[in-house]
Amino acid sequence: MEELSEIPDDGITIFSAHGISEKVENEAKNRNLKFFDATCPLVSKVHKEVIRFADAGKDIIMIGHKNHPEVEGTLGRFPENSSGQMYLVENILQAEILKVNQPENLCLVTQTTLSVSDTEEIVLKLKEKFPMLQEPKSEDICYATQNRQDAVKQLALESDLILVVGSENSSNSTRLKELAENCGVKSFLVDDPEKISSINLEGVKIMGITAGASAPEELVQQMVSKCSTLGYKVNQEISGLKEEVFFKLPAELR
């Protein structure tokens, strides 16, 4: 569901890892909805930074994709009574023409699912324009996003074609597809195993498969099974960086 108004009064609500705005949270509380906040701790950390910067009267630039759930939630954490302003920058062109009220009192946050390489050029341009800009901490970036992108670059060295399991409206899945193509490898975004049959696989001897952050493991395995029916064998699983970061479940679910 996209709106709280769609949820009945006796419904149980789970807020996604993308996070929510203060307005949405207050609406849920005012309706006495039973809800579980599954916001990613990295996103919550950025929310707290936005509130802290705003309380200090600073201007804030956020690098991210307009209308992305995480971005909407983070922008919605900026207090209306702050003396500062918050600005969204999506690309380097917007960075070049951006004007702020307090160039000497300016902070930067980013959408957590954008890797360092995704934002590098924009950050450089902003630092060039605003030398006093306070940069975000590297630990604010989703480690899983960076690891997946690094793994795709490695996978591209060994594959004739790469399937990215994920939906077209997933920004991190789309980015994986773009990275594979930038490495000179044909890449397709698929969210249904049956769609693989419509892809031209002529000359494709080695097929690589990766997945966006929100793609369930079950769907990935269905893709692998479908490829097996097309004559492809699972030869190896590339071992990327071992992730050893674990987050606790919300207290209500423990």
Feature names for model-found ranges:
Residues M1-A211, E217-R254:
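The feature marks the mature, well-folded catalytic cores of soluble enzymes
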